[in-house]
């Protein structure tokens, strides 16, 4: 906490008076914003006005909020702030993809903007690092430090929109889709991820359709069950294997919550969700001679026969020191054809931003690893918390 130092003219000891920290309005969803404004004696519509300025205009200066009287603007400046994390570095790919290294404290997470003809997708991080230790993912090699705050999650969207152009400034949405597929496991940070997604969906926030906000998870089953009671967004599951033997090796959380348990939880979520239109997205990274044989494809089809889904096959994106290779195009093609013969909608994801290490599985950031224990001790008997770590 910052401090105000008051020193009398005499030689008496310095008196330290704590200075109250300002509320960062990016940490508040609409209900919380209204409660904060009610505490200031203001009606709910005033909170809605401020939210529109923040998210529709990407405004972080109270003086620019011209439909709010000056007296109240000055009061807000004393008590609150609008502070999104800053961009430490920007890289632009030859295919138009942009990667931002976002400063969060003394560390960095990465956010990726992927423009296409009919959409613009933002890939957002939820944690500084990741504790799940998936073997094919660069983020996992960085270790884990902490969860991101609401303001650091929604702040990535705000910062990207500010750079690309706010809705009310350019006349169209700068971001049409958000995917929680950046650094970290979103379900291990529900406390902050859910309010951030609420702001993404809110008409006074970014106003995205619930079908255009996607959360990806590796399978934290208790948290997935909890998610379905908290919010309705599209779901993608990081499966990556047709059986427990392979998944235990490349996605270690499978030793805690195996595929059968994971898919049962997915089914429960689908039953609660409208955003998924009755099906989920299966993410399957293609690792050469690890999980990409035609036998693996037949096994995957049998595994998913009771799970309404579409399947995204993801050519693996290399990073230094990784023990894997990317499946050849011919192996991916054969794998895809087997799945389509079973009637599955199957898409081979186009790699974007790999020349700037912005493709799926390549995000790394700058992480001070706080926990060497991570999943190893958890597998020895500790429960994986569904609360903020």
Swiss-Prot record:
Tell me which Gene Ontology terms the entry assigns under biological process: rRNA base methylation; tRNA methylation
Q: Which reaction does it catalyse?
A: adenosine(2503) in 23S rRNA + 2 reduced [2Fe-2S]-[ferredoxin] + 2 S-adenosyl-L-methionine = 2-methyladenosine(2503) in 23S rRNA + 5'-deoxyadenosine + L-methionine + 2 oxidized [2Fe-2S]-[ferredoxin] + S-adenosyl-L-homocysteine; adenosine(37) in tRNA + 2 reduced [2Fe-2S]-[ferredoxin] + 2 S-adenosyl-L-methionine = 2-methyladenosine(37) in tRNA + 5'-deoxyadenosine + L-methionine + 2 oxidized [2Fe-2S]-[ferredoxin] + S-adenosyl-L-homocysteine
Give one GO term, molecular function aspect.
Answer: rRNA binding
Supply the alphabetized keyword list: 4Fe-4S, Cytoplasm, Disulfide bond, Iron, Iron-sulfur, Metal-binding, Methyltransferase, rRNA processing, S-adenosyl-L-methionine, Transferase, tRNA processing
List of catalytic residues:
110 (proton acceptor), 360 (s-methylcysteine intermediate)
Q: Which InterPro entries match?
A: Aldolase_TIM (IPR013785), Methyltransferase_A (IPR040072), RlmN_N (IPR048641), RNA_MTrfase_RlmN (IPR027492), rRNA_lsu_MTrfase_RlmN/Cfr (IPR004383), rSAM (IPR007197)
Q: Which cofactor does it need?
A: [4Fe-4S] cluster
This protein's GO CC annotations: cytoplasm
Query: Which Cys pairs does UniProt list as disulfide-bonded?
Result: 123-360
Q: Which Pfam families match?
A: Radical_SAM (PF04055), RlmN_N (PF21016)
- Name all Radical SAM core domain ranges: 116-355
Source domain of life is Bacteria
Q: What is its EC number?
A: 2.1.1.192
- Note the PROSITE patterns from the entry: RADICAL_SAM (PS51918)
| Entry's localization field | Cytoplasm
**Which residues are noted in the entry as S-adenosyl-L-methionine-binding?**
184-185, 216, 238-240, 317
Q: How is the cofactor bound?
A: Binds 1 [4Fe-4S] cluster. The cluster is coordinated with 3 cysteines and an exchangeable S-adenosyl-L-methionine.
Q: Does the keyword 4Fe-4S apply?
A: yes
Family the entry assigns: Belongs to the radical SAM superfamily. RlmN family.
The note filed under miscellaneous reads: Reaction proceeds by a ping-pong mechanism involving intermediate methylation of a conserved cysteine residue.
Name of this protein: Dual-specificity RNA methyltransferase RlmN
Organism of origin is: Erwinia tasmaniensis (strain DSM 17950 / CFBP 7177 / CIP 109463 / NCPPB 4357 / Et1/99)
């Amino acid at each position: 906490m910052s401090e105000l130092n008051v020193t009398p003219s005499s030689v008496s000891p310095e008196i330290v008076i704590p200075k109250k920290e300002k509320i960062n309005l990016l940490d508040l969803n609409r209900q919380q914003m209204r409660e904060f404004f009610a505490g200031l004696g203001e009606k709910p519509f005033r909170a809605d006005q401020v939210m529109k300025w923040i998210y529709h205009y990407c405004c972080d200066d109270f003086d620019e909020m011209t439909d709010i009287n000056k007296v109240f603007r000055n009061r807000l400046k004393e008590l609150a702030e609008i502070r999104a994390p800053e961009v430490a570095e920007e890289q632009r790919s030859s295919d138009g993809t942009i990667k931002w290294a976002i400063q969060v404290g003394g560390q960095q997470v990465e956010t990726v903007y992927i423009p296409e003809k009919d959409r613009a997708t933002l890939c957002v991080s939820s944690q500084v690092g990741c504790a799940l230790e998936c073997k094919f993912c660069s983020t996992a090699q960085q270790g884990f430090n902490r969860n991101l705050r609401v303001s650091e999650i929604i702040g990535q969207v705000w910062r990207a929109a500010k750079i690309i152009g706010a809705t009310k400034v350019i006349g169209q949405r700068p971001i049409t889709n958000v995917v929680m597929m950046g650094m970290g496991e979103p379900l291990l940070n529900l406390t902050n991820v859910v309010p951030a997604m609420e702001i993404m969906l809110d008409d006074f926030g970014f106003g995205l359709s619930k079908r255009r906000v996607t959360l990806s998870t590796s399978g934290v089953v208790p948290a997935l069950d909890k998610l379905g009671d908290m919010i309705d967004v599209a779901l993608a599951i990081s499966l990556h294997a047709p059986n427990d033997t392979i998944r235990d090796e490349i996605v270690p959380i499978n030793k805690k919550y195996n595929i059968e348990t994971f898919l049962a939880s997915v089914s429960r979520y689908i039953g609660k969700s409208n955003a998924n239109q009755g099906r989920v997205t299966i993410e399957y990274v293609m690792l050469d001679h690890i999980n990409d044989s035609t036998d693996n494809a037949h096994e995957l089809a049998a595994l998913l026969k009771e799970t309404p889904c579409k399947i995204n096959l993801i050519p693996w994106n290399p990073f230094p020191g990784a023990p894997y290779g990317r499946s050849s195009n011919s192996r991916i093609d054969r794998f895809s054809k087997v799945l389509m013969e079973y009637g599955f909608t199957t898409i081979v994801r186009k790699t974007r931003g790999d020349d700037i290490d912005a493709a799926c599985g390549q995000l790394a950031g700058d992480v001070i690893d706080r926990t060497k224990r991570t999943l190893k001790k958890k597998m020895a008997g500790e429960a994986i918390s569904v609360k903020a770590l």
